A protein has these predicted regions:
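Short, structured secondary-structure boundary patches
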Residues: 51-66, 190-194, 295, 396-402
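Short glycine/threonine-rich loop-to-helix capping motif typified by GTGT followed
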Residues: 54, 180-190, 283-290, 337
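Charged, compositionally biased N-terminal leader segments and the immediate start
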Residues: 1-4, 183, 188, 195
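Acidic, His- and aromatic-enriched active-site or binding-groove loops in soluble protein domains
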Residues: 58-74, 187-211
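Positively charged, Gly/Ser-enriched RNA/tRNA-binding surfaces
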Residues: 19-36, 45-46, 81-84, 92-106, ...
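Glycine-rich, mobile lid/loop segments that gate access to catalytic sites or pores
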Residues: 170-181
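TRNA-binding/sensing appendages of the translation machinery
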Residues: 1-91, 95, 103, 151, ...
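Short Asp/Glu-rich motifs
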Residues: 50-51, 180, 202, 387
Length: 410
């Protein structure tokens, strides 16, 4: 039998799980203090729903579940690979939320401010910062079309990061509608814009040359590709310059409002920036998009945007929706590398007792010590020195004994 976890998935030791529990607890505390409510959805979703979710390249990373019994036999006999699966593991929390809202809309407030902290799955090539099973911490607002929803999500998400000691980050903001207008003005056809945006979003992974090569492979107009390459090469581009290519000035006004308001709320604690190349890879985004980046990590540690058409796929009527997701694994990884310590955590000690000890008295003493310490009761070993060394190596701060009043701190 193999003892290692599957590639891209991890076993967590107690110390790391304790830190993760604390970080997730602080994030949830911030979300709940802002009036958001937590829900839960199944890990498995209908395969047809997943296929129609406009998830961009994530649709190629779905863990699919084979049909069972006679249905599998019939699917195999059909010769069509698409018939083999009827369900799959969720790749993010947006599609499940949209389905959940459509199913429960009559029981939910409007606007609906919701929390999801749960596991998602992608058939990634495992590497640092990219796992096949990972946790996302999402907040979403459904039923509010105003830019105040974007501002609130940015405010709450950044406060959550600040509350766990995360600093030095930048909130990057763009609007897909402005970007689409710019791309159309460069010569890309309207029906190719989603594909162009998905490629453009890979800029930080494959670079400008990679973007150009991928667009060329898609057989898009050479003149449009060169125009986009020139735009990328130009470096810093102002919002006014890009917005001039957009047909609706109100879109640019909303983006300016969000940038200005978010910057005022930041109050110098983090940066807020317009990022003309920000796209986000998921195809379901319809308006503003945002990401949080930091110097300690090459990719985004949080991201989100507006997805006004997703719920409508289930209901047949459009419901405005916008969400922001913290990349929990990446944030935890950065904090661990920085040697993060849980503020105000009680020291962990062991209460050692002899084999003839009255166990009622042992547990009573442990209860008294827990006013000051986190206490684990353990039988005392024959070689006390060796046992104390093992406890220290395991992260214990000290030990207490039944026949002594003081605590031995290592």
């Amino acid at each position: 039998m193999k003892t290692q976890a599957l590639k891209g998935m991890r076993d967590l030791l107690p110390a790391e799980q304790t830190l993760r529990d604390y970080i997730q607890g602080k994030i949830l505390e911030t979300y709940r203090a802002s009036g958001f409510e937590r829900i839960s959805t199944p890990m498995l979703e209908d395969m047809e729903n997943l296929d129609k979710s406009d998830g961009g390249d994530n649709l190629n990373l779905i863990f699919k579940v084979l049909k069972r019994g006679d249905k599998l036999t019939a699917a195999l006999n059909s010769g069509d690979p698409k018939q083999l699966s009827d369900m799959g593991l969720r790749y993010d929390l947006t599609l499940p939320l949209s389905r959940y809202y459509a199913a429960n809309r009559d029981k939910l407030p409007s606007p609906f401010k919701v929390i999801q902290t749960d596991r998602v799955f992608r058939a990634e090539r495992p590497q640092k910062g990219r796992l096949r099973e990972f946790v996302q911490c999402d907040i979403d607002i459904l039923g509010d079309s105003s830019p105040n929803a974007e501002v609130e999500l940015i405010d709450v998400t950044t406060r959550a990061l600040l509350n766990i000691g995360f600093t030095g980050f930048t909130v990057n903001i763009n609007d897909r509608r402005i970007l689409r207008g710019m791309l159309e003005s460069m010569g890309f056809a309207a029906d190719t814009l989603d594909s162009v945006c998905i490629t453009f979003d890979k800029m930080d992974k494959i670079g400008a040359d990679g973007v150009k090569a991928e667009l060329t492979e898609k057989q898009l107009p050479e003149s449009a590709i060169h125009a986009l390459a020139d735009f990328i090469a130009a470096g810093e581009v102002t919002l006014d310059a890009v917005a001039a290519r957009c047909a609706d000035p109100a879109i640019a006004d909303d983006l300016k409002y969000v940038l200005a308001t978010a910057n005022a709320l930041a109050d110098g604690r983090y940066q807020v920036a317009y990022c003309p190349s920000l796209v986000r890879g998921q195809g379901y985004y319809t308006g503003m998009v945002f990401e949080i980046t930091c110097p300690q990590f090459s990719g985004a540690v949080a991201g989100g945007g507006r997805y006004d058409n997703m719920v409508g796929k289930f209901l047949g009527t459009q419901v405005p929706a916008v969400g922001f997701s913290i990349g929990f694994e990446r944030v935890c990884g950065i904090l661990l590398e920085q040697g993060y310590q849980i503020p105000g955590a009680k020291q962990k000690i062991a209460l050692l007792y002899g084999r003839d000890a009255d166990f009622t008295a042992v547990l009573s003493k442990a209860a008294a010590l827990r006013d000051t310490y986190q206490v684990t009761v353990l039988p005392q070993g024959k070689k006390l020195g060796k046992q104390l060394g093992q406890l220290e190596a395991a992260g214990f701060a000290g030990a207490a004994f039944m026949d002594k009043d003081d605590v031995k701190i290592f």
